[in-house]
Amino acid sequence: MGFDHRMETDQPPVVTATLLVPLQNGSCVEAAEALLPHGLMELHEEHSWMSNRTDLQYELNPGEVATASIFFGALWLFSIFGNSLVCLVIHRSRRTQSTTNYFVVSMACADLLISVASTPFVVLQFTTGRWTLGSAMCKVVRYFQYLTPGVQIYVLLSICIDRFYTIVYPLSFKVSREKAKRMIAASWILDAAFVTPVFFFYGSNWDSHCNYFLPPSWEGTAYTVIHFLVGFVIPSVLIILFYQKVIKYIWRIGTDGRTLRRTMNIVPRTKVKTVKMFLLLNLVFLFSWLPFHVAQLWHPHEQDYRKSSLVFTAVTWVSFSSSASKPTLYSIYNANFRRGMKETFCMSSMKCYRSNAYTITTSSRMAKRNYVGISEIPPVSRTITKDSIYDSFDREAREKKLAWPINSNPPNTFV
C-alpha cells in the first residue's frame, strides 16, 4: 500500500532513487527488476550502458595510441604534401591541359579534403578516448568520410571511360575539357546528395562519443547496403569491365600486328604506360576502401568500446593509405610528373636540365630570363646545288638547332 501510495503521488525522483538502491547489490537484482516499471527499467539499462561506455573509454593501451598516432601522422604528412604537389605541378602545366589533368586534380582535392576535414578528428578521438567536439561536428566528420571515396571512385570511372575511348575508339568519341569538367561536377554533386543521410544516422545522445558505424536498425542496414552497391560495387564492376576491354585491345594489337604493323604506332607507348599506372591506381584504391565498406556492413555493436575503436581505426588507416599512395604512384610511373617536380623545386640560382624534345645543355642567363636562344650550326660548303632543296626534307638538318624552352610554358604533366 505504501508503494502504491507513493506511485500515486507526484514524486518520481523519490521512487527512482528508492528502487535503484537494490541494484547496487547483486543479490537483489531480480527483486528490483520485478518492482521496477517498464519505463524505469529502460532508463536504468540505458544509464548502466552509458556508464560502462565511460569506463571502457580508458582501456586503450598507451602503446596502441602511440602506434596509431605515428602511422596516421606519417600518412597525413605524405597525403598533404603529395597531393598539394600534384595540384601545384599540374597548375604549372599551362601549355596543354589534358582531360586527365582535370581528373587527377579532382582526386587530389578529394584526398586533401579527407586529410583536413576527417582524419585529424578520427585520430583525436582515438588518442583522447572520447569525442569532445559535439554531435554536429561528429556528423560533419563522418559526412566527409563518406563523401570523398564516392567522389574518387566515380572520377576513376570517368578516367576509365576516357582511356577506353581514347585507345579503343579514338575517332568515335572524345572526352573534351568541357565534358571532363561536367563529369567531375556530376561526381561531386550527385555523391554529395547521396551521402546526406549520414547527417541523420550519425551522432549520439551524449557529447563524449561519436559513433563509428551506422546503427544496426533496418534503416541503417538498408542505407549501408545501398551505399555499398551504388558507391562501391557498381562503379568497381564497370571499371573492371572497361579496363578488361582496353587490355584485350592492346594485347590483340601487340600480337596480331607484330609482323604487319611493326612500323605503325597503333597505340602509343605513353598511353599504354598511362593505362598501366591508372590500372594499378584503381587496384590500390579498391583494396584500400574495401575493408571500410565491409566493416560498415558488419554493423559491430559499439558496446565494446575498445574493440570498435580498434576496428574502426584500422580500417580508417587502410582506407586513408590510398590518399598517400596516389602521388607516390605518379612519381614512380610517370616521367613527366617527375620532371614537373624537378621544375617546381628548381630555384632561379640552380641549373635545371630538361629531357624534353629540345636539346638542352645548360641554362644560361638568357634562358633564366625566359628568352629563347637559338644557335645554328654553320653551313657546310656545298658542291651540289640540290643540297639546299634536300635539306628541307632532311630531319637531321632541321634538328641541328639548339633552343631553350620558355619557363612559362612547361610541358604537360600527364599525357
Curated annotation (Swiss-Prot):
Ranges per topology, Extracellular: 1-69, 124-152, 204-221, 299-309
Membrane topology note: Multi-pass membrane protein
Transmembrane residue ranges: 70-90, 103-123, 153-173, 183-203, 222-242, 278-298, 310-332
A single GO BP: G protein-coupled receptor signaling pathway
Coiled coil: none
InterPro entries from the UniProt entry: GPCR_Rhodpsn (IPR000276), GPCR_Rhodpsn_7TM (IPR017452), GPR19_7tmA (IPR047829)
UniProt cross-references to PROSITE patterns, sorted A to Z: G_PROTEIN_RECEP_F1_2
Cytoplasmic side: 91-102, 174-182, 243-277, 333-415
Tissue expression summary: Abundant expression in the brain.
Glycosylation sites: N25, N52
Sorted UniProt keywords: Cell membrane, Disulfide bond, G-protein coupled receptor, Glycoprotein, Membrane, Receptor, Transducer, Transmembrane, Transmembrane helix
Keyword Coiled coil: no
A GO term from the CC aspect: neuron projection
Cysteines engaged in disulfide bonds, as pairs: C138-C210
Subcellular location: Cell membrane
Molecular functions (GO terms): G protein-coupled receptor activity
Protein family membership: Belongs to the G-protein coupled receptor 1 family.
Function noted in UniProt: G-protein coupled receptor that plays a role in the regulation of circadian rhythms and energy metabolism. Participates in maintaining proper circadian gene expression in the suprachiasmatic nucleus (SCN), the locus of the master circadian clock in the brain. May function as a coordinator of aging-associated metabolic dysfunction, stress response, DNA integrity management, and eventual senescence. Upon binding to adropin, modulates mitochondrial energy metabolism via the p44/42-PDK4 signaling pathway, influencing pyruvate dehydrogenase activity.
Name assigned to this protein: Probable G-protein coupled receptor 19
